[in-house]
């Protein structure tokens, strides 16, 4: 596979974004005395670009590389559950699909990337599928992809994060990331298992 070129310093070195990949242990020990952790965006860019190149050298296809990045994202997603529970003195357990997706769009996204996800939509063809859209995801800003590998999307890492978070809070699903709108916007396709849809219908009927 042809290696991707990276530019971790494309953004200003002084620009920062909220990121909870680091310092989970510190928040577990001192949950209410520490400020929100922030990572310099250039540091994150350098680290993430190295992760992409490291995994690229150990796979033979883009599908395998996507799965490698998704696996790494899943580790973050599971830890986000613990982090947000520790930060919230009275955590609320969401039981409805729309509510948990709103929570991801707003709270989880802002905790990880310093902003809310751009929009959330439900598929018209099936009630089990939703789409979370992000215009120019942060992880895609630092990797230049060759034309012959234009389907590669670093946001597979973010898809793994969302999938693990949802599965960890009892909303089993599969999440895939793909590019739309001239390869700048990423859509995260969230497909819930039938058991989740059936539970949501029961809760709606018992309102």
Identify the meaning behind each predicted range.
Residues 112, 116, 169-173, 177:
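Long, hydrophobic, amphipathic alpha-helical segments used as structural scaffolds
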